[in-house]
Amino acid sequence: MDGNVRKNWLMLIILVVIIAVSAVLADQIESDFGKVEVSVVEIVDLDGYTIAAKLFVPDGASASNPMPAVVNMHGYQNDKNVQDPFSIELARRGFVVLAPDSLGHGDSGGGLNTAAWFGDPTYVMGNETALAWLIKQPYVDAANIGVMGHSMGGMNAVKLPGLFPDNVKAVVQQASSPGSPELPNLLMLQARYDEFGGFRENQPRTEELTSSETRLAALGLEAEGSIEWDTTYGSFADGTARRMAFINMDHHLLPLKNKSVAEAVDWMRLALKDGEGGSMWIDPTKQIFMFKEILGFITLLGTMVTMLPITNLLLKTKFFAPVAQPMPNRHFPDKGTWWKLATLNALIGGILYPLTTQYGGIGGKIEQWFSWAKLEMGNGVAAFFVANAVVAGTLFIFWYRNAKKEGVTMYDVGVSFDEEKTKIDWGILGKTVLLGVILFLWMYLLEGIFQWTTGQEFRFAWPYMRQFSSGQRVGFFFIYLIPALLFFLINGGIFLYGQARMKEYETPAKTQWMWWLKVVYAMVAGLFLIWAFQYLPWFLGGAGPGFETITFFQMDLSQFTSMWPLMLFVYIPEFIILFWFLTWFFRRTGKIYLGALMISGLAIWFLAAGSIYLM
């Protein structure tokens, strides 16, 4: 066996072992090493839609020993697994926990009805069906139920006590609205850097909430009074306990904060267990959920890395060998020109991000223009991809007209298979597509094996690699793949590795890493500037967020203020990682096609498999 073949097989085997061990360990942590039974249940609502929910049942819970229970609801664009920090830590302390996927999220069906969400006070996205099911379970103490939710989930949580007044005894709001003053035993986890103005009563500084009339009313205090952070008011015995906890975190990442989880867990103990922890009680600050999150990231990254040895092994075969073409090495812009091109591209991306993404998201115009565009957040991403591709493609056309006079051909930008003429070798291109399909199916099946056997998705703090829960989501994948392919072929292809082609360094390894760093600058620096404008003044003690009162050429950017800057916490690290693989694929094949296919496929898999969709 060839030495390189042996090394690639060894690398693949080691990676699969690491992934398997990480998934099994994550499963063990989730179940507190066998002390909690974890399963996914499916509940059908009155409209016939399926509500998928993750159920945590501690050892000892039975009809003769029913335990208090908590319904744990996720936020917009999230799913049941995002709430794992609360679910895991509650269950290992003696609470039955049910974490549903709201309608249109995760594995649930139905789609989100935005009109009902904002107009019907009884619409809770299927979570009432989940709670009704939970109450009927024999191992649940139906008279001691808690509800909690993050963001949108919190908006649902405050409605449930009115629908189940005899059951719900406690409410925990995680970066959400306070609800009515009549709510039983209310804990508000207030994110210091909450991007959503409504969740901080539109105050420029969260610290000023201590004198908010709305919050004073929610806590049952006099209108002229002042709230003390992390102080409990009222009594658990009569349901008037109130507390507003200050969490030094932004909206999205609040569930990952130790203090958030500790506050919520202890609140449920005080409200649902009369302050007694019982034999399963553990200090609320002693938490294990983060180990599961880290292991999930290892499975996610490890699965992507398996593309390298598999690609190398397939390119060693006679059939796929032609896919590995020599890299073009005739055209290189000088150092100064490269930095100008990269900076211009970065700035264009930074400018287009707020201008285009707001056409998606809640109330975005794209869903109004195209009835088939059901992924609300996906619409904003697609608009960003298309706009960048159009601008970069237009600039490339003008550049190429002049570059041709200097002998540059489409071969030099990784497009043509002939050095002089623009020629596509459809046989090689077909094999390239087949190779990409094999790589994608490998990752999809690998994730599926462990999702089916251990219940573990490959993710960190956000839905990434997971199985498509319906044919509808598969359809979304192919619809939104088109704008992504356009972006990665033009911006992530002919621009990066053609128009802005970089020179080789002393070794292939150094070239890979240096190219990657420069690609990150060219493709991500503009997004980082947007992130910095939104957050840095806020983080450094000023008022925020940065875009809240900004207009751009008479355009109101209020739609952009909250959700889309928040998503940069997801997109910036995601892009940084994906661009490493994009660079590797170009260097390995000498063409832009395989990299564009794989990276757009991954990006849209992450988006379509778990993203919110509309009815």
What positions do the PLM features span?
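Hydrophobic alpha-helical transmembrane segments in integral membrane proteins
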Residues: A23-K35, I612-M615
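Alpha-helical transmembrane segments of integral membrane proteins
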Residues: T343-M615
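Hydrophobic membrane-insertion alpha-helices, especially the h-region
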Residues: L10-V24, T306
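Soluble extramembrane regions of membrane proteins in the secretory/endomembrane system
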Residues: E30-F289
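N-terminal membrane topogenic signal
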Residues: G3-L12, T337
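Cytosolic-side membrane-insertion boundary helix
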Residues: G277-M307, T317-W339
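Membrane-interface helix-boundary signature
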Residues: N4-N8, I288-I298, M377-G378, W426
